[in-house]
Amino acid sequence: MDSELVSYLAEQTAEPRLVIDEDEVQVYRPVGQGAKRRINSEESDVSEDGNSKPKRVRRSSVEIIFREIKKNNEKKLKDDFKASDYEELEDDDDDESIEEESDSEFEGESSSDEEESSYDSDSDYDSETEPEDSDDDFEAPVVKIPEDRQVLSAKRRCTRSLGVIVKTVEEVTHENRLKVNSMSVCDLPIDNMADLKVEHIKFYKRNTTFTEEELAEIEEDLLAEVKARYNNMKGDFRRSKTIETTEDDKKAGEVNKYDIDDDFIEKTESDEEEEITEDDSSEQETVVVEPVDE
């Protein structure tokens, strides 16, 4: 057998050889005619004759990896230590804040200048909130609560039906615009819808700011419509519990709940009581038939 063929076959079946240099580590595998190909490499440079060159790997890479692991572990320990200290400080702050909140609740002080007080329709409020003067000379507005739960729901229905919302306006100096905080009609600090002003009503867009010119474009008829619908709904809530149309009323013509006076309501209630007493007396009367002797 030819010696060249033997050497060629030996190169094809040879194991990868690890060549260690002073500055770099290279892995080679003989591939035909002495060409070199790098094994397990992420990137490779291609030479002019088309053969791939091995990527140089620094000897200090292993040391760098271990150094990074050690650094990360030390950083994690420091972060955990700082986090534990922070939690202890945060607990102390929470205790102080709880004491401050309890004091402010008894004194009636407001906790924030920007937040508006909101009330649920399911709860009744009969007392007026009168905040005391704080150290910062902040005067919170006195909120007068509506007297009835039905009035609250009537106001909310009125708001949804008209697509309007009440706004509280404060000046924003850096933008030279009016910052508008939205609140519902039931949270208005007024006793009656008659005290409602034109500036409080506008077709709303959420998360927007309005200028003075935009607020000036609100018309009087919108306010009148709000008041009218509010009064009608309030009457609806008051009368719907006492007036019920019967089948005879439906045949003769449905009774309009909004045009019935309170005197008529009292008369109908008294008539019903008289009818009930008459029925009871008729039931108590019994006829006794004595047998006749022959």
Swiss-Prot record:
Biased composition annotated in UniProt, kind: Acidic residues: 86-139, 260-283
Chain segments annotated as coiled-coil in the UniProt record: 201-234
Chain residue ranges for the region called Disordered: 25-59, 77-141, 242-294
Bilayer-spanning residue ranges: none
Tagged with keyword Protease: no
Presence of keyword Coiled coil: yes
Superkingdom of source: Viruses
Keywords: Coiled coil
Biased composition (Basic and acidic residues): 242-259
Protein name: Uncharacterized protein ORF90
Protein species of origin: Ostreid herpesvirus 1 (isolate France) (OsHV-1)
